[in-house]
């Protein structure tokens, strides 16, 4: 970081090996599973059993900030975060379950008097390094705009904001499978079994306001 800490860059790489990582294996048909452990089971939910296996995770987190301009209407700055994780089951060679894909946040900040405002763009790449063993659902990449503003007095702060400003439809990379997509969600009866392959959608446009008082 710079001497006045107005500029900063932090890079954190990591590498981890786990000898008894709690993962999962397909249940064999003899135990009541939907299919034998060696069959793909594509397009279906699968029966699983916990298993301790060797795993490897590595990744990197990068964060930084820098001032952009100092004007009569306030101080403008730029802040950013980037994260990447890769996880693999060393016993099966499969991708680890529920690993966040490459993601980033870019924030344009503005401060003037009691005002503290942020325009944020939150992004995630497509999740296609999924666990085949669990038949994990893939998700598409997305970019969301969020707008936040606050005004502070010595003991009171007012917060206002809009999350997902443009009401973008997206699926949560770590949301799992949507189990509501069955007979109650479609005009065509599909029995009592939910449809596989529908990811849990993210929240639409959300507007909030709040007041914080310090005693």
What residue spans do the PLM features occupy?
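Feature captures outer-membrane beta-barrel proteins of Gram-negative bacteria and organelles
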Residues: 101-112, 143-149, 181-182
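C-terminal beta-signal and adjacent terminal beta-strands/loops
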Residues: 17-19, 24, 125-128, 150-215
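A generic beta-sheet turn/junction motif
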Residues: 2-4, 110-114, 151-155, 215
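Extracellular/periplasm-exposed beta-strand and loop segments of Gram-negative cell-envelope proteins
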Residues: 22-31, 38, 44-55, 93-97, ...
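Gram-negative outer-membrane beta-barrel transporters
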Residues: 8-18, 34-132, 210-214
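Short, glycine/charged-rich beta-strand-loop motifs at protein surfaces that mediate ligand recognition
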Residues: 4, 12, 133-138, 145-149, ...
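Exposed loop/turn and edge beta-strand positions of beta-sandwich/beta-sheet ligand-binding modules
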Residues: 5, 58, 74, 102, ...
């Amino acid at each position: 970081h710079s001497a006045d800490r107005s500029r900063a860059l932090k890079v954190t790489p990591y590498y981890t090996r786990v000898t008894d990582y709690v993962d999962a294996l397909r249940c064999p048909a003899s135990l009541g599973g939907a299919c034998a452990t060696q069959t793909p089971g594509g397009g279906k939910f699968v029966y699983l059993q916990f298993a301790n296996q060797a795993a490897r995770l590595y990744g990197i987190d990068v964060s930084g900030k820098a001032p952009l301009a100092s004007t009569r209407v306030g101080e403008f700055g730029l802040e950013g975060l980037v994260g990447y994780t890769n996880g693999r089951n060393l016993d099966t060679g499969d991708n680890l379950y529920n690993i966040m894909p490459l993601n980033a946040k870019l924030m344009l900040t503005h401060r003037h008097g009691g005002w503290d405002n942020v325009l944020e763009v939150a992004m995630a790449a497509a999740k296609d390094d999924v666990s085949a063993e669990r038949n994990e659902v893939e998700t598409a990449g997305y970019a969301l705009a969020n707008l936040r503003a606050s005004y502070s007095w010595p003991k009171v702060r007012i917060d206002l904001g809009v999350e997902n400003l443009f009401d973008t439809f997206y699926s949560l990379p770590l949301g799992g499978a949507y189990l509501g997509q069955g007979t109650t969600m479609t005009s065509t009866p599909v029995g009592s079994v939910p449809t596989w392959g529908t990811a849990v959608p993210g929240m639409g446009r959300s507007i909030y306001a709040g007041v914080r008082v310090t005693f």
